[in-house]
Amino acid sequence: MKYKDLRDFIAMLEQQGKLKRVAHPVSPHLEMTEIADRVLRAEGPALLFENPVKPDGTRYDYPVLANLFGTPERVAMGMGADSVSKLREIGQTLAYLKEPEPPKGIKDAFSKLPLLKDIWSMAPNVVKNAPCQEIVWEGEDVDLYQLPIQHCWPEDVAPLVTWGLTVTRGPHKKRQNLGIYRQQLIGKNKLVMRWLSHRGGALDYQEFRKLNPDTPYPVAVVLGCDPSTILGAVTPVPDTLSEYQFAGLLRGSRTELVKCIGSDLQVPARAEIVLEGVIHPNETALEGPYGDHTGYYNEQGHFPVFTVERITMRENPIYHSTYTGKPPDEPAVLGVALNEVFVPLLQKQFSEITDFYLPPEGCSYRMAVVSMKKQYAGHAKRVMTGCWSFLRQFMYTKFIIVVDDDVNVRDWKEVIWAVTTRMDPVRDTVLVENTPIDYLDFASPVSGLGGKMGLDATSKWPGETDREWGRVIKKDPAVTVKIDGIWGKLGL
Protein backbone atom coordinates (compact mmCIF):
# COMPACT_ATOMS: atom_id res chain seq x y z
CA MET A 1 0.00 0.00 0.00
CA LYS A 2 1.30 3.45 -0.93
CA TYR A 3 0.33 6.55 1.03
CA LYS A 4 0.23 9.99 -0.53
CA ASP A 5 0.09 11.76 2.85
CA LEU A 6 -0.15 11.21 6.59
CA ARG A 7 -3.94 11.05 6.49
CA ASP A 8 -3.84 8.16 4.03
CA PHE A 9 -1.59 6.25 6.41
CA ILE A 10 -3.77 7.05 9.43
CA ALA A 11 -6.88 5.85 7.58
CA MET A 12 -5.25 2.53 6.68
CA LEU A 13 -3.96 1.98 10.21
CA GLU A 14 -7.39 2.71 11.65
CA GLN A 15 -9.06 0.38 9.16
CA GLN A 16 -6.73 -2.43 10.28
CA GLY A 17 -7.21 -1.71 13.99
CA LYS A 18 -3.65 -0.38 14.31
CA LEU A 19 -4.66 3.13 15.37
CA LYS A 20 -6.94 4.15 18.21
CA ARG A 21 -8.59 7.51 18.77
CA VAL A 22 -8.48 8.88 22.31
CA ALA A 23 -11.49 11.15 22.88
CA HIS A 24 -10.85 11.75 26.58
CA PRO A 25 -9.07 15.08 27.31
CA VAL A 26 -5.32 14.47 27.70
CA SER A 27 -2.57 17.01 28.37
CA PRO A 28 0.62 17.16 26.26
CA HIS A 29 2.35 17.93 29.57
CA LEU A 30 3.57 14.48 30.75
CA GLU A 31 0.22 12.71 30.29
CA MET A 32 0.66 11.82 26.60
CA THR A 33 4.10 10.38 27.35
CA GLU A 34 2.69 8.18 30.12
CA ILE A 35 -0.06 6.84 27.87
CA ALA A 36 2.10 6.40 24.76
CA ASP A 37 4.83 4.67 26.77
CA ARG A 38 2.40 2.12 28.22
CA VAL A 39 0.90 1.43 24.80
CA LEU A 40 4.27 1.10 23.06
CA ARG A 41 5.60 -1.33 25.67
CA ALA A 42 2.49 -3.45 25.08
CA GLU A 43 3.15 -3.32 21.30
CA GLY A 44 -0.14 -1.46 20.97
CA PRO A 45 -1.59 0.84 18.30
CA ALA A 46 -0.76 4.31 17.10
CA LEU A 47 -2.69 6.95 19.06
CA LEU A 48 -4.64 10.00 17.92
CA PHE A 49 -5.38 12.25 20.90
CA GLU A 50 -8.46 14.13 19.71
CA ASN A 51 -8.81 16.46 22.70
CA PRO A 52 -5.41 17.69 23.89
CA VAL A 53 -5.86 20.24 26.67
CA LYS A 54 -3.85 23.27 27.78
CA PRO A 55 -2.68 23.88 31.37
CA ASP A 56 -5.76 26.05 31.97
CA GLY A 57 -8.06 23.22 30.90
CA THR A 58 -9.06 24.71 27.55
CA ARG A 59 -8.71 22.62 24.42
CA TYR A 60 -6.05 22.93 21.74
CA ASP A 61 -7.46 23.22 18.23
CA TYR A 62 -5.38 20.38 16.80
CA PRO A 63 -5.22 16.64 17.58
CA VAL A 64 -1.91 14.94 18.39
CA LEU A 65 -0.67 11.82 16.61
CA ALA A 66 1.68 9.69 18.72
CA ASN A 67 3.26 6.23 18.67
CA LEU A 68 2.93 6.17 14.87
CA PHE A 69 5.97 3.91 14.37
CA GLY A 70 5.52 2.03 17.64
CA THR A 71 5.96 -1.43 16.10
CA PRO A 72 8.42 -2.66 13.42
CA GLU A 73 5.41 -3.76 11.35
CA ARG A 74 4.12 -0.17 11.15
CA VAL A 75 7.58 1.03 10.13
CA ALA A 76 7.58 -1.54 7.32
CA MET A 77 4.08 -0.44 6.27
CA GLY A 78 5.25 3.17 6.19
CA MET A 79 8.10 2.22 3.87
CA GLY A 80 5.74 0.40 1.53
CA ALA A 81 6.90 -3.09 2.55
CA ASP A 82 4.56 -6.01 3.22
CA SER A 83 6.56 -7.19 6.23
CA VAL A 84 9.64 -6.38 8.29
CA SER A 85 11.62 -9.04 6.40
CA LYS A 86 10.84 -7.25 3.13
CA LEU A 87 12.85 -4.26 4.39
CA ARG A 88 15.96 -6.17 3.34
CA GLU A 89 14.90 -5.66 -0.27
CA ILE A 90 14.98 -1.91 0.34
CA GLY A 91 18.45 -2.37 1.82
CA GLN A 92 19.53 -4.27 -1.29
CA THR A 93 18.35 -1.40 -3.47
CA LEU A 94 20.26 1.11 -1.35
CA ALA A 95 23.36 -1.10 -1.43
CA TYR A 96 23.25 -1.13 -5.22
CA LEU A 97 22.74 2.63 -5.40
CA LYS A 98 25.56 3.26 -2.95
CA GLU A 99 28.08 1.18 -4.90
CA PRO A 100 26.67 0.06 -8.25
CA GLU A 101 28.49 -2.85 -9.86
CA PRO A 102 29.29 -2.85 -13.57
CA PRO A 103 26.86 -5.13 -15.44
CA LYS A 104 28.14 -8.66 -15.92
CA GLY A 105 26.70 -8.82 -19.40
CA ILE A 106 23.95 -7.55 -21.67
CA LYS A 107 21.27 -9.53 -19.81
CA ASP A 108 22.42 -8.19 -16.44
CA ALA A 109 22.52 -4.63 -17.79
CA PHE A 110 18.95 -4.87 -19.05
CA SER A 111 17.78 -6.38 -15.75
CA LYS A 112 19.00 -3.25 -13.93
CA LEU A 113 17.35 -0.79 -16.30
CA PRO A 114 13.87 -0.86 -14.67
CA LEU A 115 15.33 0.05 -11.27
CA LEU A 116 17.44 2.87 -12.67
CA LYS A 117 14.48 4.12 -14.69
CA ASP A 118 12.29 4.08 -11.58
CA ILE A 119 14.87 6.01 -9.58
CA TRP A 120 15.40 8.79 -12.07
CA SER A 121 11.67 9.04 -12.82
CA MET A 122 11.07 9.76 -9.12
CA ALA A 123 12.38 13.31 -9.24
CA PRO A 124 9.98 15.39 -7.09
CA ASN A 125 7.02 17.08 -8.73
CA VAL A 126 6.80 20.76 -7.74
CA VAL A 127 3.26 22.17 -7.60
CA LYS A 128 2.07 25.77 -7.27
CA ASN A 129 -0.85 25.25 -4.91
CA ALA A 130 -0.69 22.91 -1.96
CA PRO A 131 -2.86 21.78 0.96
CA CYS A 132 -0.06 22.63 3.41
CA GLN A 133 -0.58 26.33 2.60
CA GLU A 134 -4.35 26.45 3.01
CA ILE A 135 -3.90 28.44 6.23
CA VAL A 136 -1.07 30.93 6.78
CA TRP A 137 0.01 32.67 9.99
CA GLU A 138 2.51 35.49 9.56
CA GLY A 139 4.07 38.22 11.66
CA GLU A 140 2.35 38.70 15.01
CA ASP A 141 -0.05 35.85 14.24
CA VAL A 142 2.79 33.34 14.56
CA ASP A 143 2.31 31.62 17.92
CA LEU A 144 3.91 28.26 18.60
CA TYR A 145 2.10 28.09 21.94
CA GLN A 146 -1.10 27.37 19.99
CA LEU A 147 0.37 24.02 18.91
CA PRO A 148 0.02 21.06 21.33
CA ILE A 149 3.79 20.63 21.67
CA GLN A 150 4.64 17.79 24.02
CA HIS A 151 6.41 18.26 27.37
CA CYS A 152 7.68 14.71 27.76
CA TRP A 153 9.44 14.30 31.13
CA PRO A 154 9.18 15.95 34.58
CA GLU A 155 12.63 17.58 34.48
CA ASP A 156 12.49 18.69 30.84
CA VAL A 157 13.16 22.40 30.68
CA ALA A 158 10.35 23.20 28.20
CA PRO A 159 8.05 21.68 25.56
CA LEU A 160 9.92 20.00 22.71
CA VAL A 161 9.24 19.55 18.99
CA THR A 162 10.30 15.94 18.43
CA TRP A 163 9.17 14.83 14.95
CA GLY A 164 10.08 17.97 13.05
CA LEU A 165 11.44 17.16 9.59
CA THR A 166 14.02 19.93 9.09
CA VAL A 167 14.67 21.04 5.51
CA THR A 168 17.95 22.80 4.65
CA ARG A 169 20.17 23.40 1.65
CA GLY A 170 23.89 24.12 1.48
CA PRO A 171 25.23 26.95 -0.70
CA HIS A 172 26.84 24.55 -3.18
CA LYS A 173 24.14 21.88 -3.22
CA LYS A 174 21.20 21.43 -5.53
CA ARG A 175 19.56 18.77 -3.38
CA GLN A 176 17.95 19.60 -0.07
CA ASN A 177 18.76 17.82 3.17
CA LEU A 178 16.10 16.34 5.44
CA GLY A 179 16.92 15.66 9.08
CA ILE A 180 15.15 15.04 12.39
CA TYR A 181 16.45 17.39 15.11
CA ARG A 182 14.75 18.13 18.39
CA GLN A 183 13.71 21.74 18.91
CA GLN A 184 13.14 23.44 22.27
CA LEU A 185 10.31 25.95 22.54
CA ILE A 186 11.65 29.22 23.99
CA GLY A 187 9.15 31.78 22.67
CA LYS A 188 6.04 32.22 20.56
CA ASN A 189 8.22 32.33 17.44
CA LYS A 190 11.50 30.84 18.69
CA LEU A 191 12.89 27.30 18.79
CA VAL A 192 16.40 26.08 19.65
CA MET A 193 17.66 23.93 16.77
CA ARG A 194 19.67 21.12 18.37
CA TRP A 195 21.68 19.71 15.50
CA LEU A 196 25.10 18.20 16.09
CA SER A 197 28.00 19.50 14.02
CA HIS A 198 28.32 16.39 11.83
CA ARG A 199 24.63 16.21 10.87
CA GLY A 200 23.49 17.27 7.41
CA GLY A 201 21.55 20.35 8.50
CA ALA A 202 24.42 21.63 10.63
CA LEU A 203 26.91 21.09 7.79
CA ASP A 204 24.67 23.00 5.36
CA TYR A 205 24.39 25.82 7.90
CA GLN A 206 28.16 25.97 8.51
CA GLU A 207 28.92 26.12 4.78
CA PHE A 208 26.36 28.87 4.28
CA ARG A 209 27.66 30.87 7.24
CA LYS A 210 31.25 30.82 5.91
CA LEU A 211 30.13 32.40 2.64
CA ASN A 212 27.37 34.61 4.08
CA PRO A 213 28.41 35.59 7.62
CA ASP A 214 25.80 38.34 7.96
CA THR A 215 22.84 36.76 6.14
CA PRO A 216 19.95 34.94 7.85
CA TYR A 217 19.89 31.24 6.93
CA PRO A 218 16.52 29.91 5.65
CA VAL A 219 15.10 26.78 7.29
CA ALA A 220 11.77 24.95 7.10
CA VAL A 221 10.41 22.41 9.57
CA VAL A 222 7.69 19.97 8.48
CA LEU A 223 5.36 18.56 11.13
CA GLY A 224 3.41 15.59 9.82
CA CYS A 225 3.84 14.26 6.28
CA ASP A 226 3.62 10.97 4.41
CA PRO A 227 5.48 8.07 6.07
CA SER A 228 7.84 7.47 3.14
CA THR A 229 9.25 10.98 3.44
CA ILE A 230 9.53 10.79 7.24
CA LEU A 231 11.32 7.44 7.12
CA GLY A 232 13.47 8.49 4.18
CA ALA A 233 14.95 11.15 6.46
CA VAL A 234 16.25 8.50 8.90
CA THR A 235 17.46 5.99 6.29
CA PRO A 236 21.09 5.88 5.00
CA VAL A 237 20.29 7.27 1.57
CA PRO A 238 23.33 7.61 -0.77
CA ASP A 239 24.60 11.16 -1.14
CA THR A 240 23.76 11.05 -4.85
CA LEU A 241 20.06 10.55 -4.09
CA SER A 242 17.77 13.04 -2.37
CA GLU A 243 15.51 11.91 0.46
CA TYR A 244 12.54 13.22 -1.55
CA GLN A 245 13.57 11.05 -4.50
CA PHE A 246 14.04 8.02 -2.23
CA ALA A 247 10.60 8.64 -0.69
CA GLY A 248 9.13 8.56 -4.20
CA LEU A 249 10.84 5.24 -4.85
CA LEU A 250 9.35 3.79 -1.64
CA ARG A 251 5.91 5.19 -2.41
CA GLY A 252 5.91 4.31 -6.07
CA SER A 253 4.98 7.86 -7.06
CA ARG A 254 6.81 11.17 -7.23
CA THR A 255 6.93 13.26 -4.07
CA GLU A 256 4.82 16.40 -4.49
CA LEU A 257 6.59 19.50 -3.21
CA VAL A 258 5.70 23.16 -2.97
CA LYS A 259 8.03 26.13 -2.62
CA CYS A 260 7.96 27.82 0.76
CA ILE A 261 6.29 31.22 0.78
CA GLY A 262 9.32 32.95 2.26
CA SER A 263 12.25 31.03 0.74
CA ASP A 264 13.28 28.73 -2.10
CA LEU A 265 13.15 25.66 0.12
CA GLN A 266 10.63 23.02 -0.92
CA VAL A 267 8.39 21.07 1.46
CA PRO A 268 5.92 18.19 1.01
CA ALA A 269 2.79 19.69 -0.52
CA ARG A 270 0.46 17.57 1.60
CA ALA A 271 2.24 18.16 4.92
CA GLU A 272 0.08 18.96 7.95
CA ILE A 273 2.05 21.92 9.35
CA VAL A 274 5.14 23.78 8.10
CA LEU A 275 7.28 26.23 10.06
CA GLU A 276 9.15 28.69 7.83
CA GLY A 277 11.88 30.93 9.13
CA VAL A 278 15.55 31.71 9.51
CA ILE A 279 18.55 31.32 11.78
CA HIS A 280 20.07 34.74 12.39
CA PRO A 281 23.88 35.03 12.50
CA ASN A 282 25.36 34.36 15.96
CA GLU A 283 21.96 33.88 17.64
CA THR A 284 22.20 30.90 19.96
CA ALA A 285 20.52 29.80 23.18
CA LEU A 286 21.10 27.28 25.94
CA GLU A 287 19.31 24.03 25.13
CA GLY A 288 18.18 21.37 27.60
CA PRO A 289 18.25 19.45 29.78
CA TYR A 290 15.91 16.87 28.27
CA GLY A 291 15.20 13.21 28.87
CA ASP A 292 16.55 11.37 25.86
CA HIS A 293 16.65 7.95 24.20
CA THR A 294 19.41 6.88 26.58
CA GLY A 295 17.02 6.95 29.53
CA TYR A 296 18.80 9.89 31.14
CA TYR A 297 18.56 13.67 31.15
CA ASN A 298 21.31 15.03 28.93
CA GLU A 299 23.69 17.93 29.42
CA GLN A 300 22.94 21.46 28.30
CA GLY A 301 24.58 23.09 25.30
CA HIS A 302 24.31 26.18 23.11
CA PHE A 303 22.69 25.76 19.69
CA PRO A 304 21.31 28.05 16.96
CA VAL A 305 17.93 29.73 17.44
CA PHE A 306 15.34 29.15 14.71
CA THR A 307 13.09 32.20 14.32
CA VAL A 308 9.72 31.17 12.90
CA GLU A 309 8.46 33.86 10.53
CA ARG A 310 5.50 31.96 9.16
CA ILE A 311 3.37 28.91 9.97
CA THR A 312 1.43 27.28 7.14
CA MET A 313 -0.95 24.37 7.55
CA ARG A 314 -3.78 22.33 6.14
CA GLU A 315 -7.36 22.77 7.22
CA ASN A 316 -7.77 20.91 10.53
CA PRO A 317 -4.10 19.88 10.75
CA ILE A 318 -2.74 16.99 12.81
CA TYR A 319 0.29 17.59 15.05
CA HIS A 320 2.73 14.64 14.90
CA SER A 321 4.77 14.00 18.05
CA THR A 322 6.71 11.40 20.00
CA TYR A 323 8.79 11.03 23.14
CA THR A 324 12.26 9.56 23.67
CA GLY A 325 13.32 7.70 26.79
CA LYS A 326 14.83 4.49 28.09
CA PRO A 327 14.30 1.75 25.50
CA PRO A 328 11.90 0.64 24.28
CA ASP A 329 10.75 3.91 22.78
CA GLU A 330 9.83 4.89 19.22
CA PRO A 331 13.46 5.50 18.10
CA ALA A 332 14.37 2.04 19.43
CA VAL A 333 11.54 0.47 17.42
CA LEU A 334 12.68 2.35 14.33
CA GLY A 335 16.16 0.98 14.96
CA VAL A 336 14.87 -2.60 15.05
CA ALA A 337 13.11 -2.15 11.71
CA LEU A 338 15.90 -0.22 9.99
CA ASN A 339 18.33 -2.90 11.16
CA GLU A 340 16.94 -4.98 8.29
CA VAL A 341 17.84 -2.20 5.85
CA PHE A 342 21.40 -2.04 7.19
CA VAL A 343 22.17 -5.75 6.70
CA PRO A 344 22.36 -5.74 2.86
CA LEU A 345 24.34 -2.48 2.95
CA LEU A 346 26.97 -4.09 5.16
CA GLN A 347 26.95 -7.35 3.19
CA LYS A 348 27.60 -5.42 0.00
CA GLN A 349 30.82 -4.09 1.53
CA PHE A 350 31.71 -7.18 3.58
CA SER A 351 30.30 -10.32 1.94
CA GLU A 352 31.49 -12.45 4.86
CA ILE A 353 28.88 -10.87 7.17
CA THR A 354 25.90 -13.20 7.64
CA ASP A 355 23.82 -11.08 10.02
CA PHE A 356 23.93 -7.82 11.93
CA TYR A 357 21.91 -6.76 14.95
CA LEU A 358 21.51 -3.53 16.89
CA PRO A 359 19.91 -4.57 20.21
CA PRO A 360 17.24 -2.00 21.12
CA GLU A 361 18.46 -2.14 24.73
CA GLY A 362 21.67 -0.55 23.41
CA CYS A 363 19.84 2.69 22.61
CA SER A 364 19.46 1.71 18.94
CA TYR A 365 23.11 2.11 17.90
CA ARG A 366 25.52 1.97 20.85
CA MET A 367 26.06 -1.80 20.60
CA ALA A 368 26.13 -4.07 17.56
CA VAL A 369 26.45 -7.84 17.21
CA VAL A 370 27.82 -9.17 13.90
CA SER A 371 28.02 -12.76 12.67
CA MET A 372 30.45 -13.73 9.93
CA LYS A 373 31.99 -16.57 7.96
CA LYS A 374 35.52 -16.30 9.28
CA GLN A 375 38.23 -17.01 6.70
CA TYR A 376 41.59 -16.13 8.30
CA ALA A 377 43.28 -15.02 11.49
CA GLY A 378 42.42 -11.43 12.42
CA HIS A 379 39.36 -11.45 10.19
CA ALA A 380 36.97 -10.48 13.00
CA LYS A 381 39.00 -7.35 13.75
CA ARG A 382 38.77 -6.29 10.11
CA VAL A 383 34.99 -6.64 10.24
CA MET A 384 34.57 -4.66 13.46
CA THR A 385 36.74 -1.77 12.22
CA GLY A 386 34.91 -1.86 8.90
CA CYS A 387 31.53 -1.56 10.59
CA TRP A 388 32.68 1.45 12.60
CA SER A 389 33.83 3.27 9.48
CA PHE A 390 31.46 2.24 6.69
CA LEU A 391 28.19 4.01 7.56
CA ARG A 392 27.79 7.31 9.40
CA GLN A 393 25.06 5.64 11.46
CA PHE A 394 27.67 3.46 13.22
CA MET A 395 30.15 6.20 14.05
CA TYR A 396 28.76 6.30 17.60
CA THR A 397 28.56 2.52 18.12
CA LYS A 398 30.63 1.97 21.28
CA PHE A 399 30.64 -1.83 21.39
CA ILE A 400 30.84 -4.35 18.55
CA ILE A 401 30.69 -8.08 19.25
CA VAL A 402 31.75 -10.34 16.36
CA VAL A 403 30.68 -14.01 16.39
CA ASP A 404 30.83 -16.96 14.00
CA ASP A 405 27.92 -17.73 11.71
CA ASP A 406 26.77 -20.60 13.94
CA VAL A 407 25.66 -18.04 16.54
CA ASN A 408 22.28 -16.28 16.34
CA VAL A 409 23.10 -12.60 16.88
CA ARG A 410 19.50 -11.91 17.94
CA ASP A 411 19.62 -14.41 20.82
CA TRP A 412 21.49 -13.04 23.84
CA LYS A 413 21.87 -16.56 25.29
CA GLU A 414 23.88 -17.63 22.25
CA VAL A 415 25.88 -14.40 22.12
CA ILE A 416 26.87 -14.63 25.79
CA TRP A 417 27.80 -18.30 25.27
CA ALA A 418 30.13 -17.28 22.42
CA VAL A 419 31.67 -14.42 24.42
CA THR A 420 32.37 -16.58 27.46
CA THR A 421 33.71 -19.62 25.57
CA ARG A 422 35.53 -18.14 22.54
CA MET A 423 37.14 -15.04 24.01
CA ASP A 424 40.21 -14.29 26.04
CA PRO A 425 39.61 -10.86 27.61
CA VAL A 426 43.15 -9.63 26.89
CA ARG A 427 43.85 -11.17 23.48
CA ASP A 428 40.41 -10.70 21.96
CA THR A 429 39.43 -7.23 23.12
CA VAL A 430 40.14 -4.24 20.89
CA LEU A 431 40.18 -0.83 22.57
CA VAL A 432 40.28 2.38 20.54
CA GLU A 433 40.73 5.77 22.19
CA ASN A 434 39.67 9.29 21.20
CA THR A 435 36.97 8.42 18.69
CA PRO A 436 33.76 10.33 17.91
CA ILE A 437 31.08 9.63 20.52
CA ASP A 438 27.50 10.80 20.82
CA TYR A 439 27.22 14.21 22.42
CA LEU A 440 24.54 12.72 24.70
CA ASP A 441 26.95 10.08 26.06
CA PHE A 442 27.90 11.47 29.46
CA ALA A 443 29.98 8.34 30.19
CA SER A 444 32.71 9.46 27.77
CA PRO A 445 35.76 11.29 29.24
CA VAL A 446 34.95 14.47 27.33
CA SER A 447 31.87 15.54 25.40
CA GLY A 448 31.83 14.06 21.89
CA LEU A 449 35.09 12.09 22.25
CA GLY A 450 35.56 8.67 23.81
CA GLY A 451 36.56 5.06 23.40
CA LYS A 452 35.26 2.04 21.53
CA MET A 453 35.48 -1.66 22.35
CA GLY A 454 35.49 -4.57 19.95
CA LEU A 455 34.93 -8.11 21.24
CA ASP A 456 36.20 -10.93 19.03
CA ALA A 457 33.99 -13.85 20.09
CA THR A 458 34.83 -15.98 17.06
CA SER A 459 36.62 -19.33 17.14
CA LYS A 460 40.36 -18.75 16.96
CA TRP A 461 42.51 -19.77 14.03
CA PRO A 462 46.21 -20.77 13.95
CA GLY A 463 48.16 -17.61 14.52
CA GLU A 464 45.57 -16.41 17.02
CA THR A 465 46.15 -19.35 19.41
CA ASP A 466 48.58 -22.27 19.76
CA ARG A 467 46.07 -24.40 21.64
CA GLU A 468 43.76 -27.07 20.28
CA TRP A 469 40.37 -25.41 19.85
CA GLY A 470 37.26 -27.00 21.27
CA ARG A 471 34.79 -28.78 19.00
CA VAL A 472 31.15 -27.77 19.32
CA ILE A 473 28.90 -30.55 20.59
CA LYS A 474 26.35 -31.60 17.97
CA LYS A 475 23.52 -34.09 18.20
CA ASP A 476 23.35 -37.20 16.03
CA PRO A 477 20.87 -36.26 13.24
CA ALA A 478 19.59 -39.84 12.92
CA VAL A 479 18.74 -39.98 16.62
CA THR A 480 17.01 -36.62 16.40
CA VAL A 481 14.82 -37.87 13.54
CA LYS A 482 14.00 -41.07 15.44
CA ILE A 483 13.00 -39.22 18.62
CA ASP A 484 10.90 -36.80 16.56
CA GLY A 485 8.97 -39.80 15.29
CA ILE A 486 8.19 -41.24 18.72
CA TRP A 487 7.91 -37.97 20.66
CA GLY A 488 4.13 -38.06 20.81
CA LYS A 489 4.21 -41.55 22.33
CA LEU A 490 6.47 -40.65 25.24
CA GLY A 491 3.84 -38.90 27.31
CA LEU A 492 6.10 -35.89 27.83
Swiss-Prot record:
E.C. numbers: 4.1.1.98
InterPro entries hit by this protein: UbiD, UbiD-like_C, UbiD-like_N, UbiD_bacteria, UbiD_Rift_dom
Pathway in which this enzyme or protein is active: Cofactor biosynthesis; ubiquinone biosynthesis
Coiled-coil regions, chain positions: none
Cofactor binding remark: Binds 1 prenylated FMN per subunit.
Binding, prenylated FMN: I180, Y181, R182, R194, W195, L196, R199, G200
Lineage top rank: taxon: Bacteria
Cell compartment(s), UniProt: Cell membrane
GO biological process, one term: ubiquinone biosynthetic process
Binding-site residues for Mn(2+), renumbered to this chain: N177, E243
Record bears the keyword Transport: no
GO CC annotation: cytosol; plasma membrane
GO terms assigned for molecular function: 3-octaprenyl-4-hydroxybenzoate carboxy-lyase activity; metal ion binding
Keywords: Cell membrane, Decarboxylase, Flavoprotein, FMN, Lyase, Manganese, Membrane, Metal-binding, Ubiquinone biosynthesis
Chief location bin: membrane
Active site: D292 (proton donor)
Cofactor: prenylated FMN; Mn(2+)
NCBIfam families membership: PRK10922.1, UbiD family decarboxylase
Quaternary organization: Homohexamer.
Family in the record: Belongs to the UbiD family.
Role description: Catalyzes the decarboxylation of 3-octaprenyl-4-hydroxy benzoate to 2-octaprenylphenol, an intermediate step in ubiquinone biosynthesis.
The protein, known as: 3-octaprenyl-4-hydroxybenzoate carboxy-lyase
